[in-house]
Regions:
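Active-site nucleophile/metal-coordination loop of metallo-enzymes that catalyze phosphate/sulfate
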Residues: 2, 110-127, 141-221
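Conserved small/polar residues in nucleotide/adenosyl-binding loops
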Residues: 225
Length: 225
């Protein structure tokens, strides 16, 4: 079994993707942006997980040599890509774009969904005990869901998973700034370098500790690479 483990596990994820397709064969036609968000957070994210785990198995299978199975598995990859990229991402992406277009055009965000820029005020400022915030750049929601499941199993503790709408544009320097305490974020272009300011202060990694301490002197920001 060990020799064929990656093939079996890859096929399991294909089966999961096919089952998801059957459950949602009518496509994605949710009429409300908030509901699309809710559906993804509670259900649709599973397709991203299946896709990631399939490719993990596929990449590992390439470390062993089995000419017949390798060729067959590569044909499976084509089917998986069609199902994921065309049907899932294409269909769900269109549904989301259609239902949020008006609000995005008028406000630059969907109003009824929690905003990343409110993170500090909603989750840190009201806390009555010590809070640790770990920021992992570009970590997908479905990976967080898998991590939450693993923490529940290993620690037998209560783990709550939530989501917030990213600031726009959704790039690192804006997202990191949005998590800091602020009343207003502004962008500044100086010597062809774009900076994000929180109430006029730089939010570069070297200054985040200062921004935090300006609100709570007991705060500390640490960077790891």
């Amino acid at each position: 079994y060990e020799y064929f483990r990656n093939f079996y596990e890859g096929l399991l994820q294909v089966a999961n993707m096919q089952e998801f397709f059957k459950e949602h064969s009518a496509g994605f036609h949710t009429p409300d942006a908030k509901q699309v968000w809710k559906e993804y957070a509670e259900d649709y994210y599973r397709m991203d997980t299946y896709y990631r785990l399939f490719h993990l198995s596929f990449q590992r299978s390439l470390e062993t040599s089995n000419i017949k199975l390798d060729d067959l598995f590569k044909h499976v990859v084509d089917k998986v890509e069609g199902l994921y990229s065309y049907w899932f991402l294409g269909g769900l992406g269109k549904n989301w774009s259609d239902v949020c277009a008006d609000e995005m055009a008028e406000h630059g965000r969907v109003l009824e969904i929690s905003q990343q820029s409110d993170f500090y005020n909603e989750h840190i400022r009201p806390a009555d005990s010590r809070v640790f915030v770990i920021i992992s750049d570009a970590m997908r929601y479905e990976v967080a869901a898998s991590l939450a499941d693993e923490l529940r199993r290993e620690t037998q503790s209560n783990v709550k998973l939530g989501s917030m709408q990213s600031i726009f544009p959704s790039i690192t320097k804006f997202g990191m700034a949005a998590l800091l305490p602020h009343k207003a974020l502004t962008a500044e272009l100086k010597n062809e370098v774009l900076s994000v300011l929180a109430d006029g202060q730089s939010t570069a990694s070297s200054n985040r500790d200062k921004v935090l301490k300006g609100v709570n002197p007991a705060s500390v920001a640490v960077s790891y690479t």
